[in-house]
Swiss-Prot record:
Substrate binds at residues 33, 57, 79, 136. Mg(2+) binds at residue 15. The gene is aroK. This is Shikimate kinase. Coiled coil: none annotated. GO terms for cellular component: cytosol. GO terms for biological process: amino acid biosynthetic process; aromatic amino acid family biosynthetic process; chorismate biosynthetic process. Its main location: cytoplasm. Belongs to the shikimate kinase family. It comes from the Bacteria. It holds the Pfam family SKI. It comes from Pseudomonas paraeruginosa (strain DSM 24068 / PA7). Its cofactor is Mg(2+). Catalyzes the specific phosphorylation of the 3-hydroxyl group of shikimic acid using ATP as a cosubstrate. Its EC number is 2.7.1.71.
Amino acid sequence: MVNLILVGPMGAGKSTIGRLLAKELHLAFKDSDKEIEQRCGANIPWIFDVEGEAGFREREQAMLSELCATDGMVIATGGGAVMRDGNRQILRAGGRVVYLHASVEHQIARTARDRNRPLLQKPNPGQILRDLMDLRDPLYREIADVVVETDERPPRLVVQEILERLRKLPPR
């Protein structure tokens, strides 16, 4: 089976929904950020501090390339993975891409206490999330086979909608 690749902003539910999708489809689940952390033996904020965002993005591209080279997985990506053209090409070629859309208000509510998100460890995280959404939303949509809203919806219903919509797509 072709990979299912989840993209979207932080707080959209990529990891939660990815695990449920993988269980439903009897596939492996991989979170690209967690895979990077395991490979490096360090968490994402540390990598950002030491290598900067550019260094992290290099690691991210290598990890996405590796994960997408194998079929039969559900892959949750980091929110900024779409920022590099090379990553977008890897993701499009790597499987069916599902954009989990969440409003900025829901992102704020879901990420408010999370200290593991380097881009939000600055004053005014709400404005940062709005700016990131303005920048990234067109890129998520550019590569998505399916766009699904996650606001105010239980993860199981989101999973059901994803599966129904993917079934209606023509084979690749």
